[in-house]
Amino acid sequence: MPVLRSTFIALSRNRPLRRFCEQSRLGSRLSSRFIAGTEIADAVRVAESVNRQGMAVTLDSLGESVTSDVEAHRSAEVYHQLLDIIESRKLNANISVKLTQMGLEQSQVLAESIALSLAQHAKATGNFVRIDMEDSKLTQVTLDIVRRLNARPETKGAIGVVIQAYLYRSQADVEQLLADGIRIRLCKGAYKEPAEVAFPRKSEVDENFVLLSKKLLDSNVFHGLATHDEAMVAAAKSYAKQHSIARSRFEFQMLYGVRRDLQRSLVKEGFGVRVYVPFGREWYPYFMRRLAERPANVIFLAKNFFRA
């Protein structure tokens, strides 16, 4: 793993730096490129703007592992509010949820019950819940919960999951999820993982991403290909064209503030694009992972630091 990426991932776990950044005006200003803001109203404002540009949205209330049932239910309430707002404002948006925010590390039963309530709410309002994938020690339990919820009549089709191409296990996971008809967001993976569970080289991750993309495109389920890598985008477009796969059968997904030029270009070409819009007060770990992923993001940060 490149030194720069390792450094920013390590900094994402630095609590004193996190407190300083999340509480300072400078930190909020620098993060605004990638974070919609701290409040629900900020997220709605950005979602409406993205929709006007012809793109869909997935909303993410930032925050990871909670330490109590009360915190888990408080996190869930934000998402219930979002589902109601999406319906009332007629936003082209869904929600992305981390199970650790729903208490997974305290109780699997708690996390699954909260995810069930969100999926029921989503289905009742014609919406959809994407369960985010976290580090590899949570992969199996996350997939188990998603599969159980999708098997329930009252939530079937209203819940999907994320698969990370850098994990060795992902091909088998994709095949099982496709057999169950579960919608997938395919990404490369943003967490630091050991070579025992993940491909260590970018070229291997890219190769697996392309392989898994083709499996998704060949299915009759609507999926999202989450990448800012133009080579990955080009490979998917080429495969879809060669196999007469309609553009309505998949979408590209990208992060708010990253590769806006590519987002606009894909929309002009007639491809579906969904923008991942995060918001909330606990934005620091997410922000640092974005810096770890792309050197261009670090350059952007440096320029704006000196302007600030």
What feature does the model see in each segment?
Residues M1-A308:
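Positively charged, amphipathic and often flexible ligand-engagement surfaces
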